[in-house]
Amino acid sequence: MSLVTQILLNADDELRYPTSGELETIKSFLKTGNKRISIINNIAQNEKKIIEQASKQLWQVHPEYISPGGNAYGARQRSLCLRDYGWYLRLVTYGILAGDQRPIEKIGIIGVREMYNSLGVPVIGMVDSITALKNSTLSVLSPEDSEEVKPYFDYIIQAMAA
């Protein structure tokens, strides 16, 4: 749920207009819209590079994943891992666009640990993979934009590690 929607729902629940403070919050949020869109465009344009760098980082930390018997051994399994990278990267951009972590939680976090456990995917490997994805993404962003993006990756990492 976006910040604007949340403020409107709160005001409606209390049968009132949004307060001046809430309107200022909305105004500040809307002022950051172009910046958030620019960050998302940068990530989208660099998706392939980000995913390639992140996968190389993960395979260096966990070479056993791409060895015979590993979860990412073989072209099919490896392509599934890379598909997940793209999915998590998009999920982060949803949070950036909304300015909130709720889309990440609703779309992608609920039940993720159970899913990976049922598939035999080591959760620590997923934590490491999202960390690699975060590092790779931050490498294509400015320091200021990186600060905007970090909390969304950290949210996913913390949810998986819990």
Curated annotation (Swiss-Prot):
Entry GO terms, CC: cyanelle thylakoid membrane; phycobilisome
Name this polypeptide is given: Allophycocyanin alpha-B chain
Record keywords: Antenna complex, Bile pigment, Chromophore, Cyanelle, Electron transport, Membrane, Methylation, Photosynthesis, Phycobilisome, Plastid, Thylakoid, Transport
Protein's UniProt keywords contain Transferase: no
List of residues binding (2R,3E)-phycocyanobilin: 81
Signal peptide bounds: none
PTM-bearing positions, type N4-methylasparagine: 71
Domain of life of the organism encoding this protein: Eukaryota
Gene: apcD
Family the UniProt entry places it in: Belongs to the phycobiliprotein family.
